[in-house]
A protein has these predicted regions:
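Class I S-adenosylmethionine
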Residues: 1-55, 63-69, 185-202
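SAM cofactor-binding core of SAM-dependent methyltransferases
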Residues: 58-105
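Gly/Ser/Thr-rich loops at beta-strand to alpha-helix junctions
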Residues: 59-67, 85-89, 111-113, 218-222, ...
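Short internal beta-strands
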Residues: 79-85, 236-244, 256-262, 279-286, ...
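Acidic/Gly/His-enriched mid-domain segments of enzyme catalytic cores or analogous surface patches
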Residues: 90, 94-179, 249-345, 561-601
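Aromatic- and Gly/Pro-rich donor/ligand-binding loops
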Residues: 157-211, 222
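C-terminal catalytic or substrate-handling cores of phosphate/nucleotide-
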Residues: 285-453
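Long, compositionally biased charged/polar accessory segments in the mid-to-C-terminal portions
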Residues: 389, 393-396, 400-461, 465-467, ...
């Protein structure tokens, strides 16, 4: 009778001699073949052809068999990343990693969840100090199982591989976005810096909302929610994505806050009809600069981390730009992030609606949204208002929504939904009030439950009998009028004192921020003019001196070239530097505009 397989006395993995060589015994199973362990690994690992720019996920390396051969045969821009979710196997693997192994790093179990973020960073390293290749090195991900240790956490390894693939794909999608809009983002940033001194610091309003918060996107599901809460809207703090502003006004809802990230003037129609409306705007520092003129001083800026650059990091370290927000891709996700930041504590519920990330055939947004009204305005016999083209283009896919009916979504919208689930599914007291669209991974709350959460169940009834009853009660309340008046006066005095303090704080903030932005403008203008002179005339410098100075000036000014198709890193080639020289004049002009705004403030 065969004996029972056991680990060592402490339950740790141990190496054992088998017929074909050394294997590992752990949790009652062999992690390698008993007959030919190395041969089996070699056929699984070395038989795969690798293209340049491949990240190899070496899952559960354990004895690290064939690892040296794999690393030695790697093509250009390839790297092997050891991944181990089992703590005991991780400690065991450390003893078997070949010395001096190039292009390899082993991630511990607590580092593995951070891998997708590490793949999008300019600089990242493991906890033992091994540097990882910078973002943009990899174009694909390949998983290779080095042992049967992956069977202890099969879902974890599958999720890790998918997350790594999504991170690499997202980086290159963002690169395409930067090629298209990178210059616009940077120029908007330079101009919006001049408005910071007259804006409201976002830190001042953080954790200030005690009422339940509703976040409105512009999807179809927002209409039902808006109608349901219209009579009790004052019981909620309402945050709207920019595209949801017009539909909310149409439904009789006035939001307390609007979130904007759009960098172009296409956002202007979203604000038609806002005269006389009072709401606070939360705008990205890279958003359309004219937003400040539309909204006045009641605007809070935040900094979308649109690219991982030395320039952006230096602005953040010097406290010139507002607090940095993660790059979430969609204004609906950013609105959710801001809502969570605004609530007093985790006990304040936040509801999202209209974040459908999909739509029915014929309609793409809620009625009243700019996309809907422009379609109505341009409709004719041959081009009806119903937009069926959007649902049946070749890249769209059909899904079943939360209500069991078919919807259509695009790869971009689907990625936003996936990002939402990854960022917010574990957030406490965050609920989905939408009834249609893609599932967001949140607990569901109906509109009736929203109203119950707000503490308003019905509107007061005004009948003749009720009116008589109120008149009868008036006499009984007269003794309390003086006390209520005194309390109101005391409350007003307190508010006045708070207002004076706020005004003083705002004045100090404005003065300090204006000074720091002005210093930044002066410093950046000098550097740009110096770079312009070097590129134009050479400044009587030797070739080596000129190259070193150009490289130094470009190192912290990625905004000059990040939108180039080949602008992932700076280059000293003539064609690259000629394009940089052409960009300098744009930013010198933007600095002049910013200084003019500061001078008029």
């Amino acid at each position: 009778m065969r004996g029972i397989l056991t680990d060592d006395d402490n339950g740790n993995p141990r190496s054992v001699q088998t017929e074909g060589g050394i294997s590992v015994l752990y949790k009652g199973r062999y992690l390698y073949s008993k007959y030919a362990p190395e041969k089996a690994v070699k056929s699984a690992v070395l038989s795969k052809s690798l293209a340049p720019g491949t990240l190899v996920l070496a899952c559960s390396p354990v004895l690290c068999l064939c690892l040296a051969e794999l690393c030695a045969s790697l093509p250009e821009n390839c790297f092997v990343l050891g991944c181990e979710f089992d703590a005991a196997l991780y400690d065991f693997s450390l003893k078997y990693i070949p010395l001096g192994l190039a292009r390899f790093a082993l991630l511990s179990p607590d580092e593995l969840p951070k891998l997708p973020f590490m793949l999008t960073k300019r600089r990242a390293e493991t906890k033992d100090g091994t540097p990882l290749p910078p973002a943009g090195t990899f174009r694909r991900v390949l998983r290779t199982d080095f042992s049967a240790g992956t069977q202890f956490f099969p879902q974890h390894y599958a999720a890790l591989t998918e997350a790594a693939e999504n991170a690499v794909a997202r980086f290159w999608k963002n690169r395409i976005t930067l090629i298209k809009f990178g210059r616009r983002f940077s120029r908007n940033l330079f101009r919006n810096l001049a408005h910071l001194s007259r804006s409201v610091p976002i830190e001042r309003v953080a954790q200030s909302v005690e009422k339940p918060i509703i976040v409105f996107g512009a999807g179809e599901s927002m209409e039902k929610t808006a109608r349901s809460i219209r009579s009790v809207q004052s019981a909620f703090y309402i945050v709207a994505a920019d595209a949801a502003l017009a539909p909310l006004f149409r439904l009789g809802i006035e939001p307390d806050a609007v979130v904007c990230e759009e960098a172009q003037s296409v956002i202007a129609p979203f604000f038609l009809g806002v005269n006389g409306k009072r709401f606070r705007v939360f705008a990205g520092i890279t958003s359309w600069p004219k937003l400040f003129d539309l909204c006045g001083a009641d605007i809070c800026y935040f900094s979308p981390h649109y690219d991982d650059t030395v320039f952006f990091d230096s602005l953040a370290e010097r406290n010139i730009i507002p607090p940095v927000m993660p790059p979430l891709g969609s204004v609906g996700l950013t609105a959710t992030k801001i809502a969570l930041m605004l609530r007093k504590n985790d006990r304040v519920p936040v509801f999202v609606t209209g974040l459908d990330f999909s739509y029915r055939a014929g309609t793409t947004h809620a009625r009243g949204a700019e996309a809907h009204t422009s379609r109505l305005a341009s409709s004719c016999k041959t081009a009806p208002a119903s937009n069926y083209d959007a649902a049946f283009t070749f890249f769209m896919q059909k899904i079943i929504g939360k209500d069991g009916t078919p919807f259509f979504t695009s790869p971009a919208l689907l990625s936003y939904a996936q990002t939402f689930r990854a960022y917010f599914s574990q957030s406490p007291n965050l609920f989905d009030a939408g009834t249609t669209g893609i599932d967001l991974g949140l607990s569901k709350k109906s509109a009736d439950e929203l109203i119950r959460k707000s503490g308003n169940t019905t509107e007061a009834k005004t009948t003749a009998e009720g009116k008589d009853s109120n008149e009868a009660k008036t006499e009984n309340r007269k003794p309390a009028v003086k006390m209520e008046t005194a309390i109101a006066r005391k409350d007003a005095d307190g508010k006045a004192a708070h207002a004076k303090k706020t005004i003083a704080e705002q004045a100090a903030f404005s003065e300090q921020k204006a000074r720091s932005v002005r210093d930044f403008y002066e410093e950046e203008e000098r550097s740009l003019k110096r770079l312009k002179n070097i590129l134009s005339s050479g400044q009587n410098m030797s070739e080596n001196e000129r190259s070193a100075e150009i490289e130094k000036l470009l190192r912290s000014r990625e905004y000059l070239y990040l939108h180039f198709p080949d602008g992932l890193t700076a280059s000293l080639t003539v064609s690259f530097l000629k394009r940089v020289r052409a960009e300098i004049d744009f930013f010198i002009k933007d600095i002049a505009v910013g200084k003019s705004i500061l001078g008029n403030s």
